[in-house]
Regions:
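Acidic/polar low-complexity flexible segments
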Residues: 1-5, 77-94, 137-167
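Surface-exposed, glycine/proline- and aromatic-rich loop segments on solvent-exposed faces
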Residues: 2-5, 9, 21-105
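Extended, solvent-exposed segments with strong compositional bias
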Residues: 95-126
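Exposed aromatic-hydrophobic patches
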Residues: 128-135
Length: 167
């Protein structure tokens, strides 16, 4: 294994944010946007990335076995790069990203800072969502975020609100 970052279970509320209150979300319970691990390993000379969520409810029938969460994984491949992540979030100066991966229960998409998008091969291995980013193994920086899936948002990530709300 190249790396394994683990995150404590049960910290998916960020700055005291509430999960949506729509029936679909209430029935799923909480914890489905709780990232518990991100890992990278080498398989047959190629980098493979993996993430694990606390829970995988799938009321919308996502082929990867979940449908309510979106995870974003940004990789810093070379010096420089795009420093803007999400609104209000930036990388340290000079440590921007060159490849981002949007992970939903409906697939994984690679995005470039210029806006290019392409689907990448993804699958499940037990509790892990696994994908092949098409990169050689290397010493890359990484940034991540997890939130609620919004299929209409540019990064499939629902804007957060301290109030909760239906969606």
């Amino acid at each position: 294994m190249l790396f394994l970052f683990q995150d404590p279970l049960g910290d998916a509320h960020g700055l005291a944010y509430l999960y949506p209150q729509a029936a679909l979300c209430r029935e799923a319970g909480e914890g489905y946007a709780d990232l518990t691990a991100l890992a990278g390993e080498v398989r047959e000379g190629e980098l493979v990335l993996k993430l694990r969520l606390a829970r995988y409810p799938n009321p919308l029938g996502g082929p990867l076995g979940f449908s309510l969460a979106t995870a974003l994984v940004y990789l810093d491949l070379v010096p420089g790069g795009e420093e803007a992540l999400l609104p209000g979030l930036r990388t340290p100066p000079g440590q921007g990203w060159e490849a981002a991966f949007v992970v939903t229960g409906f697939g994984v998409e690679r995005k470039s800072p210029e806006g290019k998008r392409e689907a990448v091969r993804a699958w499940r291995e037990g509790e892990w969502v696994v994908w092949s980013p098409g990169l050689p193994p290397g010493e890359y920086g990484s940034y991540g975020a997890v939130g609620l899936c919004d299929p209409f948002a540019p990064w499939y990530l629902r804007p957060v609100s301290p109030e909760g709300g239906a969606w």
